[in-house]
Amino acid sequence: MERKLTKIEIITRPSKLEDLKDALNKIGVHGMTVSQVYGAGLQRGHKEVYRGREYDVNLVPKITLETVVFEIPVEKVLEVAQKVLRTGKFGDGKIFVYELSDAVRIRTGHRGVEAIMDIPGEKAE
């Protein structure tokens, strides 16, 4: 049976990043990419005061954490992420799940699951 690659993209508050990384590491999710992003969702930004004037801030700072899993159940990742991130307030974020058709490790040419697996005996420099 061929193992399926699934990409999980989590967009949430920057203040939750360390808790999210720790929780994902505990369930075996170690490889991830994190980006600082700005977005507007249902909360549509907020107002800030600068030098006595009020300004609309339409884009709110967020982080995006992306990971690809094949052994760890997707539902487990979703459950853990929601548990860590949910405050019940606007701005908790979104999680997107994508099926991947392939992945390529550029250095070796490995494809599919082998492209994201740890290779025994190899160390990053």
Where are these regions (language model features)?
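Positively charged, small/polar-rich N-terminal and surface patches that mediate targeting and assembly
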Residues: 1-125
